[in-house]
């Protein structure tokens, strides 16, 4: 937990805004369309085996950077070894390896879930997916690996009941999380078209 007198917590969903870019939209549309075009070209130019290898490499990159942001990072070499079930004899390094592997496996699970999503419905940008992602990640970890430095055990798929700090960042007050989720669910499902969707994915 954090010490409330020493932190300024977000308690209102207006602090969440803007959920979508409000300026230079024309330029952003050009950029997002180019991303879509290049992605389509890449998918069509790679052999399926190569494409799968690229996806797995990107998963490892996602795991490395996401966990590093949260102060749980480990060396990419440690991640590669962990994927081969070769864990360090150092407890802290091994724990970070397990977190990295759980992150990668959770991403695979969620990708499979969204493989057949009709993107005009933007189901993958709802708060339900955030909760499912939380469950998919932390549900793969033993209790000791889900225990914060303050001794709080993170419950997979549950909205927290304490105020916390993630790395150097004070998270929104726990009592306001549902309001933030509600604002998210009121915004992103209204997006229409590939250009808006890609902007929404980046913003979310």
Residue ranges: model-predicted function:
Residues 1-204:
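FIC/Doc superfamily catalytic core
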């Amino acid at each position: 937990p954090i010490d409330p007198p020493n932190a300024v917590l977000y308690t209102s969903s207006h602090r969440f805004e803007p959920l979508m870019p409000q300026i230079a939209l024309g330029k952003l549309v050009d950029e997002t369309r180019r991303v879509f075009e290049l992605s389509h070209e890449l998918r069509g130019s790679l052999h399926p085996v190569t494409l799968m290898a690229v996806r797995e490499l990107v998963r490892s990159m996602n795991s490395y950077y996401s966990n590093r942001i949260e102060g749980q990072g480990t060396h990419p070499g440690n991640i590669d070894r962990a994927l081969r079930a070769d864990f360090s004899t150092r407890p802290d390094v091994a724990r970070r390896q397990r977190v990295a592997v759980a992150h990668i496996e959770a991403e695979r699970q969620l990708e499979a879930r969204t493989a057949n999503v009709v993107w005009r419905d933007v189901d993958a940008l709802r708060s339900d997916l955030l909760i499912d992602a939380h469950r998919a990640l932390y549900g793969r970890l033993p209790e000791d690996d889900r225990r914060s430095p303050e001794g709080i055990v993170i419950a997979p798929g549950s909205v927290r009941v304490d105020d916390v700090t993630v790395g150097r960042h004070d998270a929104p007050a726990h009592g306001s999380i549902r309001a933030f989720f509600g604002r998210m669910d009121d915004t992103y499902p209204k997006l229409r078209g590939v250009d808006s969707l890609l902007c929404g994915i980046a913003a979310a």
